[in-house]
């Protein structure tokens, strides 16, 4: 029997958090907020299957994310998903599969599956201390950007996201959207909708945020949350391009003020954008969190 998949709602947060806590991961997709916000833009639904959390992408041929839960529950869920695909006469496929996930599959089903990693989806993981201090020769250029910002904008200030400034951040985000052609680009528009909803629901989603000002004017903000016990994930970062150094400044200040209780910071993937990839690599990630797509060897079975 095919389980009933539903779109995640705010009232599902406790349930989904419960399953994510059973299988901690440094993959940026493994938070309720990420699932909830992006399900508004894409056809992703969830179900509980054999006591494992399963997401299904209904816009991409009914593929499934690697199940979340304890190992025995994950294996039972995988068996059921394979049977569902067989009954529906469709190819079995899993997305968002980490090397650790695939290693477990190889143990259960040796030689039956292949994985193809997508470099565009790999998350950049950094040492928190290095992002905060920017110490060392390799990050000298980043320190220069910070110093330049301080010289150009001596009235700058940093503050945590709060009820007192969230509406001003929302208005800044609207200006950013209008000046960056988001209305004419479906991908940019979807990402902007996620940004706006992140601000609107920052308390309900358990977000921390940071705000950068030049005088009274907000020139940058960022939003993120705990991913697992040793890793914080930054979901959103917006700055005005004409404010020189605003991006590196909000990055550094946010980590220094909000993330020092964590060993690592996940700054998500680069989506294959060359400029974004160059920038993320320039901060010297300690490793990349790889994710891939799994299919059966030999196709449908």
Task: Describe each PLM feature range.
Residues 1-21, 292, 298-301:
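Short, extreme N-terminal leader segments that mark the start of a protein/domain
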Residues 90-108, 119-122:
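Short, glycine/charge-rich beta-strand/loop segments that flank catalytic centers
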Residues 93-94, 159, 264-267:
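Short catalytic-loop micro-motif centered on adjacent basic/acidic residues
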Residues 101-115, 144, 271-288:
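Conserved active-site alpha-helix within GNAT-family acetyltransferase domains
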Residues 164-217:
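Short, conserved active-site entrance elements at the starts or edges of catalytic domains
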Residues 207-297:
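Aromatic (often tryptophan-rich) hydrophobic motifs at membrane interfaces
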